[in-house]
Amino acid sequence: MELLLLSNSTLPGKAWLEHALPLIANQLNGRRSAVFIPFAGVTQTWDEYTDKTAEVLAPLGINVTGIHRVADPLAAIEKAEIVIVGGGNTFQLLKESRERGLLAPVADRVKRGALYIGWSAGANLACPTIRTTNDMPIVDPNGFDALDLFPLQINPHFTNALPEGHKGETREQHIRELLVVAPELTVIGLPEGNWIQVSNGQAVLGGPNTTWVFKAGEEAVALEAGHRF
């Protein structure tokens, strides 16, 4: 499988998806036709989200079609060489994808050679479940099971920092709560600016920041760019 799982879409001082464009270009391998799944968008319309994505990716020669715009979404997925899933609210993304019957077709198409690109919520959707999202559950997705394209759980936008005076839990504390009730999981704390690239059977960590791996009953392990999962 070919996957590009990004923690986030924007870095300080850079345009939207700017840091991801070289990564995407490097993994295209001649692919040009893409379907975009915009359902995580809540404060922007799906048309706006699709148009913005199409504009940014056009210089790479990628032709983007919004999955919500086509009469036959399953046929569009089958024809697509690239499946792109944008960030936003992971619960809405999963709900809409499940209700439209897209989960199994997307997973099958990616397993048969389509490139999967997802940032934030889109990275969460590639995991076995969405249980490591940071998002508010604004809708009920009727279960947390997701695409299961990547075998580990990703927590995007990972940071353990708290604002001064803040008395809430750290991100690690939230992850540790999950590992109490689901000790079989492995969670990747993927900070902003980092990504996981899967190609030719290898999953490789990229980005300038330390990534953390959390397992039940074990200390967190720090990983740097180049680590192979």
UniProtKB/Swiss-Prot annotation:
GO terms for molecular function: dipeptidase activity; serine-type peptidase activity. Keywords: Cytoplasm, Dipeptidase, Hydrolase, Protease, Serine protease. It comes from the Bacteria. The keyword Phosphoprotein does not apply. It is found in: Cytoplasm. The keyword Calcium does not apply. GO terms for cellular component: cytoplasm. One of its GO terms (biological process) is proteolysis. The active site is at S120 (charge relay system), D135 (charge relay system), H157 (charge relay system). It holds the Pfam family Peptidase_S51. Signal peptide: none annotated. It is an enzyme of class 3 (hydrolase). It catalyses: Dipeptidase E catalyzes the hydrolysis of dipeptides Asp-|-Xaa. It does not act on peptides with N-terminal Glu, Asn or Gln, nor does it cleave isoaspartyl peptides. Its EC number is 3.4.13.21. Hydrolyzes dipeptides containing N-terminal aspartate residues. May play a role in allowing the cell to use peptide aspartate to spare carbon otherwise required for the synthesis of the aspartate family of amino acids. Belongs to the peptidase S51 family. This is Peptidase E. It comes from Salmonella typhi.
